[in-house]
UniProtKB/Swiss-Prot annotation:
Residues 361-445 form the KH-like domain. One of its GO terms (biological process) is ribosome biogenesis. GTP 2 binds at residues 191-198, 238-242, 303-306. GTP 1 binds at residues 9-16, 56-60, 119-122. SUPFAM superfamilies: P-loop containing nucleoside triphosphate hydrolases. Belongs to the TRAFAC class TrmE-Era-EngA-EngB-Septin-like GTPase superfamily. EngA (Der) GTPase family. This is GTPase Der. CDD domains: EngA1, EngA2. It comes from Bradyrhizobium sp. (strain ORS 278). One of its GO terms (molecular function) is GTP binding. The keyword DNA damage does not apply. Keywords: GTP-binding, Nucleotide-binding, Repeat, Ribosome biogenesis. GTPase that plays an essential role in the late steps of ribosome biogenesis. Residues 3-167, 185-360 form the EngA-type G domain.
Length: 456
């Protein structure tokens, strides 16, 4: 029998949208009105190489016995009983509600693996709502956007520890460093059309596996190939070139670009191929911005380097240009390559391995605390309306990419410039080049906020 997962949560958190995305077709009716799904639907879901049965349920909601709402809840309880694991979905934009808290207890009592999915996490408000969901005690929230397909890579990583392989026994242990090293690194190679992506992979494979041509747009689909380098496995996605939206005219090409975006979301490391003779165009910057938003490690591969005239200081100039145009991922590794000639391949593969290690990094608590005290001492937060902002403490909530929550007195008053200072200082201190660093602000609860003043 197929491994079965039930999607549960209160009404209108995006359960049916997630169901449709995993099943790959619009089987469930989706609307903004709560309670659209009135019975449970089952479908065969696929997430990368994982196959399982998914059950979409009506929103968990309490109602009078015998009412439609009560029958919807009965269907949900039946789905939970049938399931091997649960997706507990919340709306990150709304944040936690009393219903979420009540039904989190309901999910815990099921005594089954639960993945907490903070849906609609795109944007600043979604990030805050996701951090708030730690209070449910269901583990680390996985930030996703079912509508836009964001966070599917993180969902895959968590799900692969729960969904058993076809023939092997289930292994629910947390992935160790040794296990991570034995698993192929997922790499997406992206860039403008005709940047040389397929030529590079063909040289890695030693065969004409991927069609190459001087004509831009030869690759229509996202194609995965297995590569081994120095005993380490890689699953590399060659993608259709990402063009400017105004130039995407054919329906087939629109689908190809969507496929490339999916490859970025499933990847752990993204290699952005730049043309040595025509680098850092607007579309390159847009692609890099997408990689940062998706929280992926970035490596810059400057292709066709063999066509450049040898001049001293070229790489240093390239480093300055990259940090100028890509301040959101300062220090991204730069590798000069020639896909056609096979030059720089070893340097590129080593850069991918190192970027992957940085992306997975967890900072020791003692070192994080020492850095935090020093960063504030060197550059205290600014005063607002004559009052100094208080930064209480910082903690790392996850890796992949390194993400932190900073507890402070007034989250809305801390300027973005100061937040950038903290990110850059952390990146430099802990050597986190080329990977997004997330710092989410959260106000520390004031225990006296709700107490009345004593009458004089």
């Amino acid at each position: 029998m197929s491994f079965t997962i039930a999607i549960i949560g209160r009404p209108n958190v995006g359960k049916s949208t997630l169901f449709n995305r995993l099943v790959g077709q619009k089987l469930a009716l989706v609307d903004d009105m709560p309670g659209v799904t009135r019975d449970r639907r089952e479908g065969e879901a696929k997430l990368h190489d994982l196959h399982f049965t998914i059950i979409d349920t009506a929103g968990l909601d309490e109602g009078p016995k015998g009412s439609l709402t009560a029958r919807m809840q009965e269907q949900t309880e039946t789905a939970i009983a049938l399931a091997d694991a649960l997706f507990f979905v919340i709306d990150a934009r709304v944040g936690l509600t009393p219903a979420d808290r009540a039904f989190a207890d309901f999910a815990r009592r099921a005594d089954k693996p639960v993945l907490l999915l903070a849906n609609k996490s795109e944007g600043k408000h979604g990030e805050l709502g996701a951090m708030e969901s730690y209070a449910l005690g269901l583990g680390d929230p996985i930030q996703i956007s079912a509508e836009h397909g964001e966070g599917m890579g993180e969902l895959y990583d968590a799900l692969s520890k729960i969904v058993p392989p076809s023939d092997d026994e289930d292994d629910e242990r947390e992935e160790t460093d040794e296990e991570r090293a034995s698993r192929p690194i997922r790499v997406a190679i992206v860039g403008r059309p005709n940047a040389g992506k397929s030529t590079l992979i063909n040289h890695l494979l030693g065969e004409e596996r991927l069609l190459t041509s001087p004509e831009a747009g030869t690759t229509r689909d996202s194609i995965a190939v297995e590569v081994e380098w120095k005993g380490r496995g890689f699953r590399i996605f060659d993608t259709a070139g990402l063009r400017r939206r105004s130039r995407i005219e054919e329906k087939l090409e629109k689908l190809s670009v969507a496929d490339a975006l999916r490859a970025v979301r499933f990847a752990e490391v993204v290699v952005l191929m730049l043309d040595a003779q025509n680098r850092f165009e607007e579309q390159d910057l847009r692609i890099a911005d997408l990689v940062e938003r998706e929280g992926r490690a970035l490596v810059l591969a400057v292709n066709k380097w063999d066509l450049m005239e040898a001049q001293p200081g070229q790489i240093s100039a390239l480093r300055r240009d990259a940090d100028h145009w890509l301040p959101q991922i300062t220090g991204a590794p730069i590798v000069a390559v020639s896909g056609l000639m096979g030059e720089g391949i070893d340097r590129l593969m080593q850069a991918i391995v190192e970027a992957y290690a940085v992306w997975n990094r967890r900072v020791p608590t003692a070192a994080l605390n020492r850095w935090f005290e020093g960063a504030i001492a060197n550059n205290p937060p600014p005063a607002v309306s004559g009052r100094r902002l208080k930064l209480n403490y910082i903690t790392q909530t996850k890796a992949r990419p390194p993400s932190f929550v900073l507890f402070c007195s007034r989250a809305d008053a801390i300027p973005q410039s100061y937040l950038r200072y903290l990110v850059n200082s952390m990146r430099e201190t802990f050597e986190l080049p080329g990977t997004p660093v997330r710092i989410t602000l959260r106000e520390k609860a004031n225990p006296f906020a709700h107490k009345r003043k004593r009458p004089n």
